[in-house]
Amino acid sequence: MKVFDVHKFDMKKEQDFLQVQFNLKNRINLSPTIHPDSINTCAGVDLAYWEQDGEPYGVCCIIVIDADTKEVIEKVHSMGRISVPYVSGFLAFRELPLIIEAAKKLETEPDVFLFDGNGYLHYNHMGVATHAAFFLGKPTIGIAKTYLKIKGCDFVTPEIEVGAYTDIIIDGEVYGRALRTRRDVKPIFLSCGNYIDLDSSYQITMSLINQESRLPIPVRLADLETHVLRTFYQKNHV
C-alpha cells in the first residue's frame, strides 16, 4: 500500500510535536468522503509495547477484513525499537513509525482504518487515528476503550441499549461519542479520525460489532494479535 511522506520523526521537543500538530490540524477533513454502504474492506490497527535490555520496543498489527463476511483478508505487522519519547498528548509520534512500516506491507488497500485509540477526541484534535490518516490517505476512525478527559469535561453515560450514544461536547464542539456497542457493557469512545464524518463513523463501527467484544471486529483482532506477537518477541528476544 502506498504511504505518503508527511513529516519526519526525528523530533524530541514538545514544541516541535505541537507545531506539527497545529500544521496538520488545519487540514483535517470531517466531511463524508465515503458512504458506509460502499465499504468492502476495513482494517483494525493496534500496538503493544515491552522493554528489552532496558530499551522500549513495540509491535504494530494491521488486520484487514471483508466488511460483509467479516473474514480476515490480510494481516501484517511491524516490530522495532521505539525511538520517540513518550510525551502526553503526542502519542501518535511514538506509534506512527511502526504503523507506517506495517501499512507499507499491505497488499490490500482498506477502504477505512479503525484505530485502537483516539482521533478527533484529543486535546488538539490530533489523536493517532487523525494523525495517521495524513500518511495513509484513507478515512480513519478512532476507537478508545478509556475516556480522555479534555478541559475537565466528563461524558454523559449513554442508555444501556445497543447503539445508544451521547455526543461528547467540549466548549460547544462535538469531539466524539460515548457509544454503547453491547447491552450493559461499558461504552467505547468513538471519534472521527480524518476524511470521514461522525455519523458515518458511527454506522461503520456498529456494523462491525459482534457478541464477542464491545470493540469493532478488526480492532479486537488487531488487539489480540499484538499480544500474541509481543509474547513471541519477548520470549525469543528478537
From Swiss-Prot:
One of its GO terms (molecular function) is single-stranded RNA binding. It comes from the Bacteria. Its EC number is 3.1.21.7. Disruption phenotype: Deletion of the ywqH-ywqI-ywqJ-ywqK-nfi operon has no visible phenotype, however it is out-competed by wild-type cells. Mg(2+) binds at residues 46, 116. The record marks 86 as: Interaction with target DNA. Its main location: cytoplasm. DNA repair enzyme involved in the repair of deaminated bases. Selectively cleaves double-stranded DNA at the second phosphodiester bond 3' to a deoxyinosine leaving behind the intact lesion on the nicked DNA. HAMAP family: Endonuclease_5. This is Endonuclease V. It comes from Bacillus subtilis (strain 168). The gene is nfi.
